[in-house]
Structure formats: C-alpha cells, structure tokens
Amino acid sequence: MRRALPWFGLLLLTISFVRLVRLPGPIHPTPVPVVRGERPLVVVLDPGHGGADSGAMCGTIMEKDLTLDVALRAELLLRLKGYTTVLTRDNDRYVSLAERTAMGNHADDSLFVSIHFNDGQRAAASGVETYYAGQSAGPAGFFSWLSSWQRSASTPLAAKSESLARFIQAALVERTRALNRGIKSEQFYVIANVRHPAALVEGGFITNKSDVTKLTTTEYRQQIAMAISDGVHRHWEARRDEPTLTLAAARPE
C-alpha cells in the first residue's frame, strides 16, 4: 500500500491538472467608461415656508403644511429611484432663505427643487407653474454685481435650470391635469442663489376653490410628488445622455 500511494497521488494530480486546463481563464471585462454624474449626488427638496411663516392660507389650510407633505412624498419616490435626497426642513420649523440656499450649494453635483403653492389676487386664478432663474437681462438685474466671467458662466446653469423646470412642469400637467401656466424665469432668492440646476414649483392656488379642494386630498398631493420625481428623473436622464465635449485650449502659433 505504501508503494501504491505515490502513484495514486500522481494520478490525482494529473486529473486535477487536466480539469484545471479545461476551465476558462480569468475573465477580463472590457472597461466601461464611467459617465460623469451617473446620478446626482443629492436632490435637495425645499418645502417652502415653515414655523411662524405659514405661507398662503385658506382657513386652516396652510401652505407650509402642504409643501412639507409633498416634499416628504417626493423624497421617498426619489430614493426609490436611487437618488440621494436632502430636505431643507423635515418638520414645522422656520428656515431662512440663506440657510436653504446653503443646503442647496453643499453638494458638488446636485439639483434643487423648491416646493410652493400659489396665493392669487383673483379667486379665479388656478393651475400649476414652474420657475427657474434665467440670466439677468441687464446691468441693473439681480446678477449685476457679478463679474462678466461669472455672468457668462451662469448661462449653461440657466439652461439646465430651464430644462429641469420644463420637465417638472410637463410632468405636473401630465399627472394632475391642472391648467398649464407654463414655465417662467424669475430671480427668486432660493433658486437664483443656488449654484446648481434649480426650479421652484407652484403646485396650485390655495386661493382657488377647485385647486384647494384637490390639494386637501392625499391622492392629489401624491400626484404632485410623483410629478416632481418624474421631472427630476427625466431631466437627469436627458442630461446624462448629452455628449460631453472637451475643448482644447488654443495654442499661439
């Protein structure tokens, strides 16, 4: 038996070697280029008003409560899509405009969506609209204190903000079937002072009987939240698919 063991061991070694040779070699997958900004690091949701600042009111219905409810719903939906989210407030407390924009500027690559509901001078005013901060038209505008380089650099940002507003507005109309009041350019503080694509949503008129009746239902507020989530996602998909161009600096001859 002792003389047979070396031969038996040699046989096992041979079989193992043959089996090893038949196995496929290590797989080296083709490197896939990482798309910059595959997902925004942060989607900042800004429920308007809060604390002593109730916003628009209709009886006991307060804008600050509606904005927080919609923001919490939108946050969950965005997280389910794989986005990281931040809320400028997650309870009934006052947050200054400066604090809100600071949170919006914290991440290097993010989106900012401020959520509001309208207060119309006419009871007949109704519908949904979305704002973005376009480039100031003249030297007396909001950005007049910026250098010329900074003003020119704000143009791509304004275009991205307009895209975000457009996608959110389209989703709002699609989801709620509300009157489409379109997208508009305004230098509202919270969106004009964020260094990333930003939009401000007006999800209906608290001063309109039809609008406020719908806003008191969880189903309708869920539709608004879904529209915000849809709009953010569609904007990001469109932005992700855009070709990235590398511009070479001109060399003096």
Q: What do the predicted segments below correspond to?
A:
Residues 1-253:
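Catalytic-site microenvironment of enzymes
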